[in-house]
């Protein structure tokens, strides 16, 4: 029986859903970071449980032809790019396979063609948002990412998947914090001032927002810092302070103060303008979000007479992108601030046929149904946990001709598709989309039609 710190030669047979290598030894399934199928490795045993175990690569005896050496192992250790060691074409294949496996194993569906994953021409430096912790490492204030499953900061200058101008602003701000001797947050001692830097950048507008997350309100010499930042980065339109004095993993506290400029920035997506606040949910990969939303619109095959329900509507990015092509859009979102943003975004784009409510999707559906609203298409974009049974039942009771499902988790999508099929809807096509290159995450669009 293998035990901790034993070293054994193994061959990696597959990848897990989150990109770990899988090896089978003595009836145990081992999960090994930074190991790819067909690779032969010397593996150190880290932990053994009842049926599964964890190992690490001690050395490679034979490497995969699909291993990418563009990335240092540090990026894998932080989880920034947990698939960055796999060539990009194979990443896309892996993501398609995740969707196929989920549909087959969870929904029992294997007769639907899952299209090749839509990918990026340049699958790095794509993120329009960064959330970076500030800590002391070896006596110096540093910015970077935490190592996986820990709160030990790994200092980073090039974040690989973030917009390069965002990286430059983070490094510049870090240097100013050092220069002005502002103390980084110490989680253990609950001391220090600067907890996090959050940066957002409009992909098309170039407008930048910087949020300083602090433990208290006073920031020494903040006016001089702001002056230097806007002199070096004229695209910075908003500098905000957020105060978070709680012992929590949540990045933001409840209090926001605008220190410079506006409290929002703007960007465009599929031709519409959007106002983005520090807390707004806005897809972090603009180019691929446009492909995702356009795929959902194409699948829905909308007509000028259609009434569409946009469930989980956020700040309106999906519904507003097709509103001018249909009769009416009814949007529901549980976060009230997002609904207010959606209404502002509709006004900003002179769109008058959208109707938003702040409520649970289930309650909104019941209310619309009572009012006699009959949707032709229901478009859903739920969080990772997927849809509730009650939502699925309420949506099918309205008898739309199509349900277009945007998913960020193939397993919960497959579970939901199974219930939709039991209630008289048929899955007809699925398109995976790579919103998060270099990571194991995959989004997809699925079309269900009334049988």
UniProtKB/Swiss-Prot annotation:
Q: Which GO BP terms sit in this record?
A: rRNA base methylation
Going by the record, the broad EC class of this enzyme is transferase
List residues of the TRAM domain: 1-59
User: What PROSITE patterns is this protein classified in?
Assistant: SAM_MT_RNA_M5U (PS51687), TRAM (PS50926), TRMA_1 (PS01230), TRMA_2 (PS01231)
Give its E.C. classification number: 2.1.1.-
Entry keyword Amino-acid biosynthesis: no
Active site as annotated: 408
Keywords assigned by UniProt, alphabetized: Methyltransferase, S-adenosyl-L-methionine, Transferase
The UniProt annotation places S-adenosyl-L-methionine binding at 283, 312, 333, 381
One Pfam match: TRAM
What molecular function terms (GO) are annotated for this protein? rRNA (uridine-C5-)-methyltransferase activity
**Family label:** Belongs to the class I-like SAM-binding methyltransferase superfamily. RNA M5U methyltransferase family.
Report the protein name in the record. Uncharacterized RNA methyltransferase SMU_788
The organism named in the record is Streptococcus mutans serotype c (strain ATCC 700610 / UA159)
């Amino acid at each position: 029986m293998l035990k901790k710190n034993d070293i054994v030669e193994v061959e990696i047979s597959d990848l897990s859903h989150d990109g770990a290598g899988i090896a089978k030894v003595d009836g145990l399934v081992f999960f090994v970071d930074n190991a790819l199928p067909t690779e032969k490795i010397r593996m150190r045993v880290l932990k053994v449980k009842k049926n599964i175990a964890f190992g690490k690569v001690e050395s490679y005896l034979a490497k995969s032809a699909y291993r990418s050496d563009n990335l240092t192992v540090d990026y894998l250790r932080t989880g920034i790019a947990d698939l960055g060691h796999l060539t990009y074409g194979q990443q896309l294949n892996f993501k398609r396979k995740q969707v196929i496996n989920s549909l087959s194993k969870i929904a029992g569906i294997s007769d639907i063609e899952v299209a090749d994953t839509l990918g990026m021409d340049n699958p790095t430096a794509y993120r329009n948002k960064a959330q970076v912790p500030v800590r002391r490492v070896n006596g110096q204030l540093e910015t970077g990412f935490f190592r996986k499953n820990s709160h030990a900061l790994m200092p980073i200058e090039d974040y690989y998947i973030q917009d390069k101008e965002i990286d430059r602003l983070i490094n510049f701000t870090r240097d100013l914090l050092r220069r002005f001797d502002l103390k980084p947050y110490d989680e253990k001692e609950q001391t220090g001032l600067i907890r996090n830097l959050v940066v957002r950048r409009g992909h098309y507008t170039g407008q930048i927002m910087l949020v300083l997350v602090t433990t208290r309100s006073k920031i020494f010499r903040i006016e001089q810092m702001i002056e230097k930042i806007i002199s070096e980065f004229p695209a910075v339109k908003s500098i905000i302070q957020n105060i978070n004095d709680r012992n929590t993993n949540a990045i933001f506290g409840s209090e926001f103060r605008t220190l410079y400029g506006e409290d929002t920035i703007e960007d465009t997506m599929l031709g519409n303008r959007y106002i983005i606040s520090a807390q707004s949910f806005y897809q972090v990969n603009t180019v691929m979000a446009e492909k995702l939303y356009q795929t959902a619109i194409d699948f829905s095959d909308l007509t000028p007479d259609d009434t569409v329900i946009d469930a989980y509507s956020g700040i309106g990015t999906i519904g507003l992108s097709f509103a001018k092509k249909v009769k009416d859009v009814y949007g529901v979102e549980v976060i009230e601030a997002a609904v207010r943003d959606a209404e502002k975004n509709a006004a900003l784009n002179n769109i008058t046929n959208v109707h938003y409510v702040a409520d649970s999707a289930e309650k909104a559906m019941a209310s619309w149904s009572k009012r006699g609203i009959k949707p032709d298409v229901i478009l859903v974009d739920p969080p990772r946990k997927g849809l509730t049974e009650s939502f699925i039942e309420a949506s099918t009771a309205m008898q739309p001709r199509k349900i277009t499902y945007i998913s960020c988790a193939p397993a919960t999508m497959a579970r939901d598709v199974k219930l939709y099929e039991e209630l008289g809807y048929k899955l007809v096509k699925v398109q995976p989309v790579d919103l998060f290159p270099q990571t194991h995450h995959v989004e997809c669009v699925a079309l269900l039609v009334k049988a």
